[in-house]
């Protein structure tokens, strides 16, 4: 009788390429042959192709979701004839602490780039770890001096696919504690360096996550002392910030009030932005026709909805508001927190044209300071080189 381990390598690879991501850990623990095969680059290419094929054909969308300071792989179905559904498929391959091998369940922020995740823990001193969920590989990043609560980060790569981390510190609204620092970490050299050519006349709010696209990171930024808003991009090849990039609207931000602006991506080539005015509650979703570190063109208003027709106080939180676009159904799904209930609830709002609106309760959020974050996910073939 033929057993799995006796099958030809090509056939075995074809079978294992269809295994869901959340089951790969069990596959790898079965035997050394399967473990080695699952980490082979040719196998991984098949896995990525299969994953993308399933995403195109399936009515369900698989995303990474952060809730209650943990990271999950979640299936979202908004194409059924009843109500949209959000089904957790389980945690991705466990993120563990190298020091004690305990599972890390205190992730306060997540930054995504090309299948890799940069996670910031909410420990007393804050820690950074880069994680490839597919391989289960991690690298804990030691600070040059120390990390701070209001630090902002970006994960990207240069033209040679060398990954780097940008750390931003700018306490614009705390002049007595004013610190402006920009540091860059290289995976190749395992070291930080100060980005010396930066003296910005703009600032990025600490809760602004930014958006990684084609290796570079884009943020919504505002000029200091003046209500002028725009996008700013950090190019990980030149290791510099580019020029101000236009937005298709004018937003307002101050210590007392602010509009909501968040970024997302459409596929691997387009940038999308959500804008909601605090005064009118009108929500706009725009998509780029061209996006580079030095040029952005907007030519498509994907969706415009008057949310005041739904509720006179329906405004997304500036700290939340992560979203994605479903082009098949022509809707946008926005993730937020409902803080009006007796308990905080993580919510998803499915909004479309002609008054289409669905509200989905994802579940209770145990922590007031944790906001739901969602990003699309495809496995990365980038292996994180372990430090010796």
From Swiss-Prot:
One Pfam family name is F-box
**Which Gene3D superfamilies does this one have?**
1.20.1280.50
What InterPro entries does the record tag this protein with? F-box-assoc_dom_typ1 (IPR006527), F-box-assoc_interact_dom (IPR017451), F-box-like_dom_sf (IPR036047), F-box_dom (IPR001810), Gal_Oxase/kelch_b-propeller (IPR011043), SCF_F-box_component (IPR050796)
Residue ranges of the F-box domain? 1-47
Taxonomy, superkingdom: Eukaryota
Q: Which NCBIfam families match?
A: F_box_assoc_1 (TIGR01640)
Entry protein name: F-box protein At5g42460
> Could you tell me which species this protein originates from?
Arabidopsis thaliana
């Amino acid at each position: 009788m033929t057993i799995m381990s006796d099958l030809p390598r090509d056939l075995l690879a074809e079978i294992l390429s269809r295994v869901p991501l959340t089951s790969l850990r069990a596959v790898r623990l079965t035997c050394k042959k399967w473990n080695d095969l699952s980490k082979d680059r040719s196998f991984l290419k098949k896995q990525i192709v299969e994953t993308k094929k399933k995403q195109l054909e399936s009515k369900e969308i698989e995303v990474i979701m952060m809730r209650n300071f943990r990271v999950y792989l979640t299936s979202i179905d908004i194409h059924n004839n009843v109500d949209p559904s959000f089904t957790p498929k389980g945690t991705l391959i466990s993120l563990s602490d190298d020091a004690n091998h305990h599972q890390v369940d205190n992730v306060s922020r997540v930054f995504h780039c090309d299948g890799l995740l940069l996670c910031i823990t909410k420990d007393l001193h804050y820690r950074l770890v880069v994680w490839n969920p597919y391989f289960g590989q991690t690298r804990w990043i030691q600070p040059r001096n120390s990390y701070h609560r209001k630090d902002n980060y970006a994960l990207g790569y240069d033209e040679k696919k060398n990954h780097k981390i940008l750390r931003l510190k700018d306490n614009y609204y705390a002049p007595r504690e004013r610190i402006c620092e920009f540091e860059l970490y290289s995976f190749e050299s395992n070291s930080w360096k100060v980005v010396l050519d930066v003296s910005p006349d703009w600032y990025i709010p600490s809760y602004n996550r930014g958006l990684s696209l084609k290796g570079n990171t884009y943020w919504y930024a505002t000029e200091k002392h003046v209500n002028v808003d725009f996008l700013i991009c950090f190019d990980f090849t030149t290791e510099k910030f580019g020029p101000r990039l236009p937005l298709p609207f004018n937003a307002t931000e101050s210590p007392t009030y602010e509009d909501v602006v968040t970024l997302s991506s459409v596929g691997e080539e387009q940038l999308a932005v959500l804008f909601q005015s605090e005064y009118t509650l009108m929500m706009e979703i725009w998509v780029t026709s061209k996006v580079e570190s030095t040029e952005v063109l907007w030519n498509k208003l994907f969706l415009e909805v008057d949310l005041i027709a739904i509720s006179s106080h329906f405004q997304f939180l500036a700290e939340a508001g992560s979203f994605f676009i479903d082009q098949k159904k022509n809707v946008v799904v926005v993730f937020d927190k409902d803080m009006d209930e007796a308990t905080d609830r993580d919510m998803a709002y499915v909004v479309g044209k002609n008054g289409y609106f669905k509200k989905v309760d994802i579940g209770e959020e145990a922590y007031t300071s944790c906001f739901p974050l969602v990003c699309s996910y495809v496995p990365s073939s980038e292996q994180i080189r372990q430090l010796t």
